[in-house]
A protein has these predicted regions:
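Metal-dependent phosphoester-hydrolase catalytic domains
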Residues: 27-159
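A long, amphipathic alpha-helix that forms part
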Residues: 1-13
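Acidic/histidine-rich, metal-coordinating catalytic segments
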Residues: 13-28, 32
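Structured helix-beta-strand junction loops
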Residues: 12-14, 57-58
Length: 159
């Protein structure tokens, strides 16, 4: 099972942080259209259950905690202009224990970094834990996103 090597996180220090490209969209709100992902990876019940087990040891999804109702993505397929249509998914996560989550001043996904020539298909996920000397604590509003896609209106390029 996915979790067995990782269960020591729950018995380790409370200030644990687990982050990276986990390739799991935690909920349907983390993909542009849940219907487009039926039968695909990243959204299966088994994957989501494994992620929920990891979070159950006391880890907070700090980006979703900061932007609970916002459409924020960290990955867009290169094919079919998915980025420019904002047809993405949020599969890059920062999960933090209580002491770290309490220090989060700002958390966001830098969509601008995904633009330009030769970018990664992922955008950086950034968390500010402390206020900078100049008072900067990151964006107070999430980067603008397109409106929610009508369910079933778009297909994945590989579908």
């Amino acid at each position: 099972m996915f979790m067995s090597p990782h269960t020591t996180v729950g018995s380790g220090p409370a200030a644990a942080v687990v982050c990276g490209d986990v390739n799991i969209a935690p909920t349907d709100a983390d993909v542009f259209d849940p219907d487009a992902y039926i039968g695909q990876t990243h959204v299966t019940p088994r994957e989501r259950e494994a992620l929920a087990e990891l979070q159950a040891v006391g880890l907070h999804d700090v980006v979703r905690d900061r932007w609970p109702g916002e459409r924020v993505f960290s990955y867009w397929d290169y094919r079919a202009g998915m980025f420019h249509q904002d047809l993405g998914m949020r599969i890059d996560l920062i999960l933090a224990g209580d002491p770290v989550a309490a220090r989060v001043q700002a958390a966001w996904i830098d969509r601008q970094a995904r633009k330009g020539k030769g970018p990664s298909d992922h955008a950086p996920v950034i968390v500010d834990l402390d206020e900078a000397p100049d008072g900067d604590i990151g964006p107070m509003v999430p980067p603008p996103s397109n409106p929610v896609t009508r369910r079933g209106a778009k297909k994945l390029p590989q579908a």
